Amino acid sequence: MSCTIEKVLADAKALVERLREHDGAAEVLIEQTTTLNKRVEAMKQYQEEVQELNEIARHRPRSTLVLGIQQENRQIRQLQQENKELRTSLKEHQSALELIMSKYREQMFRLLMASKKDDPGIIMKLKEQHSKELQAHIEKITEMTAVMKRAIEIDEQQGNQEHDRIVKLEQENKWLRKTLQITRASFLNLHKEDAAESSSHSASSVPNTDLSLRKS
């Protein structure tokens, strides 16, 4: 019995460490999204300046205008590529998060079953609560992903209207940042929940296990 609880706690501790690692990855993605948003703002400002220069461009050679348009197109393509890479990273991060959350809930449920076998009512209540929390988190991610995909579809429908494409890219970046903030908040909540539950079980049900973890 003691060995089983110690193993479950060790597994839960390992999962918490993985959550911390993914929390760091979420921080990096948020920083990347912030940088991309700044670049989008710079592109908008650049577009405004181009419109102003168009007023006096009639007196300049056509080759100068062509060169400016080519440069703008390169910048937009680069921004789109970075957004694509960011979406891929976000998708991988979400998949890892869902897998870790599932394993984390399973380990905590096993721990509660091992320490509270005589009270099936509590076990059932906790199982339902964890299922609702996980479902709510998945629904949030699904909703944000749907909005992001819709923004991408709208962007693709605009054709060669460069100004509209820049606006849609900006919206896409905002949704990416908001989605990453949701995943990061979920990581922090899981970490706080794990700390509270570990403290409670160490003080009441499995004091010897806590001593074993400290030695490890």
From Swiss-Prot:
Residues 33-102, 131-185 form a coiled coil. Residues 193-216 are annotated as: Disordered. Residues 206-216 have a biased composition (Polar residues). Transmembrane segments: none annotated. It comes from the Eukaryota. Keywords: Coiled coil, Cytoplasm. It is found in: Cytoplasm. InterPro entries: SIKE. It holds the Pfam family SIKE. GO terms for cellular component: cytoplasm. Belongs to the SIKE family. This is FGFR1 oncogene partner 2 homolog. The gene is fgfr1op2.
